[in-house]
Amino acid sequence: DEVIHYMNSRAKEPKPITGAAWVDGKVYLRLAGAKSAVEATAEKWTGEVMEQGGQFWQQLQHMQHEFFAGDEPLWRFSVGSTAENPDLDGPWLIDWAGSQRWYRGEADIAKLETMAQRAGGQVSLFRGGDRTDEVMHHQPRALKEIQQRLKKSFDPDGIFNPGRLYSWL
């Protein structure tokens, strides 16, 4: 939670920060913009400059970082950036200054949904794991109805990815 606070406090500063992530116990901040602003910020903030920084951020964006490899279930939490991290043992990767969090490990989706809701968000089983039931965060009836009406208006014949996200959509 200290890391989440740190990333969010940096993101609030009037600096050219365009990315904030926590991977393998390290915080990564991406700076981009006017050269003078980037240099001034890099000089003021402590840390190291990554030689392959562009490659690192691209790997995160396209889920090609080694964290995303492997057979263990991969869960994606989309939560409030300042919310406490759910109390789960196992590897985590935190991106978007805390708004997107990835967890690797076996878990019960109902338990994870409760944790995600407490953090102001949702969770989905992104890859692997038991896919015999819903893998996306369960939706309340009102949201289901809205999504079904939207789907019907954009795809009246139901030919585009039926049941891909939800069995009822």
Residue ranges and their predicted role:
Residues 1-71:
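C-terminal substrate-binding/cap subdomain adjacent to the FAD-binding core in PCMH-type
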Residues 24, 47-169:
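Conserved glycine-rich FAD pyrophosphate-binding loop
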